[in-house]
Every structure is written in C-alpha cells, then in structure tokens.
Design a protein with these regions (language model features):
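Periplasmic c-type cytochrome electron-transfer domains
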Residues: 8, 13-14, 25-397
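Short, Lys/Arg-enriched N-terminal segments with co-localized hydrophobic residues
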Residues: 1-8
C-alpha cells in the first residue's frame, strides 16, 4: 500500500483536485444558512428522468476533465477505438448507424471523436465541433454500465448497473498531461482494471476498491461498501468529489463541505436514485450452475455454513443497517478505517455470479475462494462436497 508521505509530489496532484473542488465553492451562497447533510434521504424521483441522468449527465464536470485534466486533447490525439476498448471503455451499439463499424478505421483517434459525437462511448459526453472535441466530461455510466458484447467484445447494448470491471480508471487518468509526476503515475497505474480509490484525493492513502454493482439495490438497507448513507449519498459524494461536478456535498464527519451555485447535482439525486432502484440483479444464465448441487448448497447456506445469519433472503444481505467490523469477517481493515462507520456491510448476493472478483478489495478471485475464506476464518469445518454445493447455490442467486 502506498501512502501519501511516501510520494511528496503526490501532494501537488492532490492540490489539483482540491482546487477543482474549491472552484465550486466560489459561486456559493455566503448567508450562513445551514445545509442539509448529504446523508439525509431524498424524496421519490422519476426513474425515466433518472436513466437520462445516469447515462448522459455530467453535472457540469467538463471544466475539470477539459480545463484541468485536458482529456479532450488526449482523446483527440492519441485514443483510437482499439485503445479505448483496451482501457475498458465501452461502445453502445444502439447509438451506431447500421454497418458503421465495417466502414471506419478503428486505429484512428478521429473515429473515437466520431463515436463521441454519436453519444456512443458509454460514460463519456463530449461537445464536438467540426471534428474537434471542445469539451468532454464523464457520467455515472462510465463505471456503472457495461455492454453485452453482442457486436464484439466491448461493443453491444448497454447493461446499466453492471460494474465495468474492464475499466481502468487509473490508467485513463494517467494519460492526463496534468498528472505526469512519476509518483502520481505510480499510484494511478497501480490500481488496475475494475478498481478505483474514491478516497485517495481526500486522504492521500492508496488503497483502491472494486467498482461495485449499481443493480439489485431496491430493498437493500445498506447500499455501499462501508454503509455511510443511502445510494443518494454515494451518488452525491462521487459526483462532487470524484467526478468533480458542479454540485454541493456536505458531510461533517468526513470534514467535507462543498457548496455550489447553481447546484447541478443535488436536484437530480431523487431521479438518479429512483432509476438505480429499478435495476434488477441479473439472473444467472441458463445452464450456468448445477441445480441439484445448488439445492444441497442452500441447506448448507442456512445451516452449517451460517451464511443466512447475515445474508438474509430475499436480498441476501442484512435486514437492518448493520455494518461489521473487519475483525468479524477477516476483511482488510484499511477501507473501513477511511470511512466513518469503521465497518463493512453484508454484500447482497443476488447477481454475485456476474461480478468477480469478490470482497471490496477483490481479494477473492472466485466464489470458491469466498467460501474457502469463511470456512477457514470462521472454523466451519465444511467438507469438500459441502463447499462445492455452496458455490453452486451462490451461482444460482
């Protein structure tokens, strides 16, 4: 694990991010009125409007991704479609004119610009004029949408809510001319695909987590890894402090108080959350598990495996808002210590087959590794057959 003090020049980079946030505050009201904490629930929203926000709304973050990071220059000059796919960006096939892929040069950055003009690059939103990118920003879908690969790998129909475990956010950020210090490069290129550190620019600790699913959250009491607040809280935190959007975020426990006028984030949180809560966990593909073994595994799950004590049906997570200390589950404690709860939620198991690796840090490559971890840590004494059956049950959820 890399610590800020190990890399003095990282402080300079953190200043870049901090100044970007400070710029948001310049337009804020100065009347001293209290601001509602970002942990508070939001009112019901419109999921149809929320889908548009999830897919296409940058909340005004173009000034960071364009003016500060200069990513428009990088894309324009060096990111052809094959490079974009290699760093995990996805292409929405429904946005493409018929037959276009057979007519364009996938090694030419100009093709990427054309795809951006079509709104076909999932999670990127660009203003293109006469073949030149003028502004570029990012949306929620960058990390929390995948595609079904129905055209080819990385190109297909959108799968909103799926974690993009191919996306390499650190590698993408490392392309910015503003982030070329060797110490910063060492941090960003250490993350790897499917991992992002949402606290690094706040505390300087390098300890990335897996990009989580944004599906299957309806009825789940604790919606984030460390349970700081509802999904609207995390949406606001990420939008303002990570995407560097023009919005307000207030959490005194984290010591963050950012006010923006106009606030382009907070009014959209109800609709965004409403859409996310409509996204179901994906059912397992037909033939992907042994039904008889899964039935036996269900018995283990509720019996000797003791899994059901925390993973309570039908969502297969804690029924209440409980979080567990790392010592209860044998988890790495670093992320828990960086948040405000000091613990981790019980991860919902619906759709678990879809998003390996497992645990917040990706330390379990397979569901079998998950079972082995808890069998050893809790001293369950499961037989080889019981563990295999339990894996089949988990694959069936």
């Amino acid at each position: 694990m890399l610590i800020e003090e190990d890399f003095p020049m990282i402080r300079k980079t953190l200043v870049i991010f901090t100044l970007a946030l400070a710029a948001l505050v310049l337009g804020c009201d100065d009347d001293g009125d209290a601001v509602t904490t970002s942990r508070d629930p939001v009112p019901p929203g419109n999921p149809v409007a929320g889908r548009q926000i999830f897919r296409f709304d940058t909340f005004g973050n173009e000034r960071f991704w364009t003016d500060t990071l200069r990513m428009h220059e990088v894309i324009q000059s060096a990111v052809d479609p094959l490079t974009a796919l290699a760093v995990g960006l996805k292409v929405d096939a429904d946005a493409l004119p018929p037959g276009i892929l057979g007519q364009v040069d996938l090694t030419d950055p100009a093709t990427t610009v054309a795809l951006l003009e079509l709104d076909a690059v999932v999670g990127l939103k660009a203003e293109v004029e006469n073949g030149t990118i003028r502004r570029v920003g990012v949306t929620c879908a960058l990390c929390h949408s995948d595609v079904d690969d129905s055209v080819q790998e990385g190109i297909g129909r959108r799968l909103d809510g799926y974690p993009n475990r191919d996306l390499d956010p650190g590698r993408i950020l490392s392309l910015s001319p503003a982030l070329q210090d060797p110490a910063v490069q060492a941090v960003l290129t250490s993350w790897g695909p499917g991992r992002y550190d949402a606290y690094w620019n706040h505390d300087g600790v390098n300890d990335p987590s897996m990009i989580p699913p944004a599906y299957g959250l309806d009825g789940v009491a604790v919606e984030t890894f460390t349970g700081e607040g509802p999904v609207s809280y995390w949406n606001a935190y990420v939008a303002v402090t990570q995407m560097h959007s023009q919005g307000s975020f207030f959490d005194p426990e984290l010591g963050i108080d950012i006010r923006a006028t106009p606030d382009l984030v907070t009014p959209k949180l109800p609709d965004l959350q409403a859409y996310q809560l409509t996204l179901p966990a994906p059912a397992p593909p037909g033939g992907s598990f042994d039904a008889e073994a899964a039935a036996r595994g269900q018995v283990v799950f509720g019996g000797q495996g003791t899994c059901a004590g925390c993973h309570t049906p039908p969502t297969f997570t804690d029924a209440g808002e409980r979080v567990h200390s790392p010592s209860e589950t044998g988890m790495d404690p670093v992320l828990a210590g960086r948040g405000t709860t000091g613990g981790y939620r019980t991860t919902p198991l619906r759709g678990a087959w879809q998003h390996p690796p497992y645990f917040h840090d990706g330390s379990a490559a397979t569901l079998g590794d998950v079972v082995e971890h808890y069998d050893a840590f809790l001293g369950l004494g499961l037989s080889v057959q019981q563990k295999a059956d339990l894996v089949e049950f988990l694959k069936s959820l």
